[in-house]
A protein has these predicted regions:
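Extracytoplasmic/periplasmic copper-protein system
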Residues: 163-168
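Terminal targeting segments of Actinobacterial cell-envelope proteins
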Residues: 1-6
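Hydrophobic membrane-insertion alpha-helices, especially the h-region
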Residues: 9-25
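N-terminal post-signal-peptidase region of extra-cytosolic proteins
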Residues: 71-72, 82-87, 132-136
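Beta-strand signatures of extracellular beta-sandwich domains
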Residues: 98-100
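An anionic, turn-rich surface loop/hairpin at beta-sheet edges
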Residues: 109-137
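Short, exposed beta-strand-loop hairpins at the edges of beta-sheets
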Residues: 137-160
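Transition segment at domain starts
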Residues: 25-80, 114-117
Length: 168
């Protein structure tokens, strides 16, 4: 092997190693096979033990970029506070997953529109399976936000979404 080819091979190997490391960091492919289960208790409407929260709106997830299922419920708590409850959620794990309320409608085939209008980020997804609660900020007009989505911020993609239907 000539001396001029050795540096080229070392540089090529270094570029491949760096590209692989960056790709692993960005895409986190191991998250496709990991599960993070959460089982939070439902919030109580009052300080009285056993009191139930009042349901304001409900919906069921449909799949977008990844298979997603489960139900959502907006619940009225003591003092006018509201919470979003995800029940029996099942979706893929992924990088930078958040729970959003969106003012955009749910589309069956694609959730790419859900970041087009206004949205409220309720926080990072606590787990890709199970039951979990998210506080809805005070002053949120739930008539303007009719969709819940599991949103991947890194890839600007909806894993799944649910249309909120107001309860009478």
């Amino acid at each position: 092997m000539s001396r001029t080819k050795r540096p080229v091979r070392w540089i090529t190997a270094a570029v491949i190693v760096v590209a692989a490391a960056v790709g692993l960091y960005l895409f986190q492919p191991w998250r496709l096979v990991t599960t993070d289960r959460v089982d939070e208790a439902p919030p109580a409407a009052t300080g009285q033990q056993g009191a139930a929260a009042k349901p304001l709106a409900t919906g069921s997830f449909i799949s977008h970029e990844h298979d997603t299922s489960g139900s959502v419920e907006v619940q009225q708590l003591e003092g006018g506070k509201a919470t979003l409850r995800l029940t029996n959620l099942r979706t893929s794990d992924g990088p930078a997953l958040h729970v959003w309320l969106s003012d955009q409608p749910v589309k069956q085939a694609d959730g790419g529109n859900l970041d087009d209008g206004k949205h409220i980020d309720l926080g990072s997804l606590k787990g890709n399976e199970g039951n979990q609660n998210y506080v809805i900020p005070a002053g949120t007009d739930l008539n303007k936000f009719s969709t819940v989505t599991i949103w991947c911020e890194r890839f600007s993609a909806s894993f799944g979404a649910a249309e909120l239907k107001q309860r009478a």
